[in-house]
Amino acid sequence: MPLFAICRGLQEVNVALGGTLHQLVHEVDGRRDHRSPKSPDNDVNYGPAHDIDLVEGGVLHRLLGARRVRVNSLHAPRARLEAVADDGQVEAFSVPDAPGFALALQWHPEYKALENPVSMKLFDAFAAACRARADARLAAPLRAAAE
């Protein structure tokens, strides 16, 4: 089943795979405060906050065709590192052993997704994986009946 984990979803997948979380990462020396700004304007809260470096050859690098993209910020050994903020904060990972699409992001691509080419590529890839899984599940009974 395709998996596209966003924000806390990334954290949940990380823990499910045996990873740990640091609850107060903003208090770690050298780390940026990745929490949401306190603004009544969601365009400020969910606006682009920092760049992330994509791991060459990873799922995100292949999907987006870039090595560095700008993302918002509100806020893995069986996980494959996919993107890191310039302060070292993990921003994305994939699950290489998953039978299909399995990508976890720390940022929020759903905010104004139709206006953001990076978000659109991510959701297009997830939708394609969902369609492929649905097609395979629908085809299985037909194959069984034909045998």
Q: Where would I find each of the regions flagged by the language model?
A:
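Catalytic nucleophile loop
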Residues: 1-20
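Short, surface-exposed, charged loop/turn segments at secondary-structure junctions
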Residues: 17-29
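Amide-donor transfer/coupling interface in amidating biosynthetic enzymes
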Residues: 1, 26, 30-147
